[in-house]
Swiss-Prot record:
CDD domains: TilS_N (cd01992). It is found in: Cytoplasm. PANTHER family: TRNA(ILE)-LYSIDINE SYNTHASE-RELATED (PTHR43033:SF1). Its main location: cytoplasm. Disulfide bonds: none annotated. Keywords: ATP-binding, Cytoplasm, Ligase, Nucleotide-binding, tRNA processing. It catalyses: cytidine(34) in tRNA(Ile2) + L-lysine + ATP = lysidine(34) in tRNA(Ile2) + AMP + diphosphate + H(+). The keyword Hydrolase does not apply. Pfam families: ATP_bind_3. This is tRNA(Ile)-lysidine synthase. Ligates lysine onto the cytidine present at position 34 of the AUA codon-specific tRNA(Ile) that contains the anticodon CAU, in an ATP-dependent manner. Cytidine is converted to lysidine, thus changing the amino acid specificity of the tRNA from methionine to isoleucine. Belongs to the tRNA(Ile)-lysidine synthase family.
Length: 295
């Protein structure tokens, strides 16, 4: 099905603007009702009404109606949201045979992510959010990274598109919200200065990133053969494991990356041992290949 996409729509201004701009390319709309606010049903209604108006196919995951028992051991709320969301997107993707999904991350989200990465003193090759990335079997496409949240709200108002503002975005419960509130106080000059700093950082690393992507794609083609990995220069290995974890839908961190490299080095001759990624998810080495499993 050429040029057809799924789209994730929350009912907020970003995703409603994206839906309106790209609806001619959309095969189906995906909405998750987490029931995390008293008025979350209103978000769903806004999305339903829009889809009905333009005769768009809509799929809804409702945490009060659909089975969420598999997520009961997840203690971090943001991780809980993320796992539910992407499992749902992947399910619809497989049902419809469409791998590409439009995501409404915008310029503010991009800079918030960049700021948080810099604050963690991580070994960064790329700051912010990529326009296109792969997550499990999904291809995520973010067309709005050059648009500010304010401009998207203005767009919705100019087109009389109904949207909802999620008041939990202003709670200090989450570190991203603290960064969001801080950046909201920046003037245009400070905002643009930081944006250019991030873009320049990414531009400087572009050659290395492209080379790394090429090596990772070759590794995928070789079914994650450990001999291929072991021959790679050490300065690429951490980044390859980072991409591997993203590829299988596991959130990377430096400790996990270092432990996996150590696991591969210790078990390069084959072993029945498994490395636990989280809860019931593991990797093991069999026939010189890294295998991912859910038990």
């Amino acid at each position: 099905m050429k040029h057809k996409y799924l789209i994730a729509v929350s009912g907020g201004p970003d995703s409603m603007a994206l839906l309106n701009k790209k609806r001619h390319l959309v095969e189906a709309v995906c909405h998750v009702n987490y029931h995390d606010r008293e008025d979350s049903d209103n978000d769903e209604k806004i999305v339903r009404d829009y889809c009905k108006k333009y005769n768009l196919k809509l799929f809804v995951f409702d945490t009060h109606k659909d089975d969420v028992s598999k997520y009961k051991d997840i203690n971090n709320l943001q991780t809980w949201y993320r796992e539910i969301r992407y499992d749902f997107f992947e399910k619809i993707s497989q049902e419809l045979g469409i791998k590409k999904i439009l995501i409404a991350h915008q310029k503010n989200d991009f800079l918030e992510s960049a700021y948080m990465s810099l604050n963690k003193n991580k070994k960064n090759l790329f700051l912010g959010i990529r326009r296109k990335s792969k997550f499990r079997s999904l291809i995520l496409i973010r067309p709005l990274l050059n648009k500010t949240k304010k401009s998207l709200e203005q767009y919705c108002r100019s087109k009389n598109i109904e949207f909802v503002i999620d008041y939990t975005n202003f709670w200090d419960r989450y570190s991203r919200n603290v960064v969001r509130k801080m950046m909201a106080e920046w003037d245009k000059k400070t905002f643009q200065k930081f944006y250019l700093k991030v873009k320049w950082f990414n531009l400087k690393n572009m050659f290395f990133i492209k080379l790394l992507d090429s090596k990772f794609n070759n590794w995928i083609k070789q079914d994650f053969d450990i001999n291929y990995f072991l021959k790679i220069k050490n300065n690429y290995k951490e980044s390859l494991i980072y991409l591997f974890l993203n590829h299988i839908g596991i959130k990377p961190n430096e400790n996990k990356i270092e432990q996996i490299i150590e696991f591969i080095n210790k078990n390069k001759n084959g072993s029945v041992k498994k490395y636990r990624l989280k809860e019931n998810q593991f990797i093991e080495i069999k026939n010189k290949k890294i295998l991912y499993s859910i038990c």
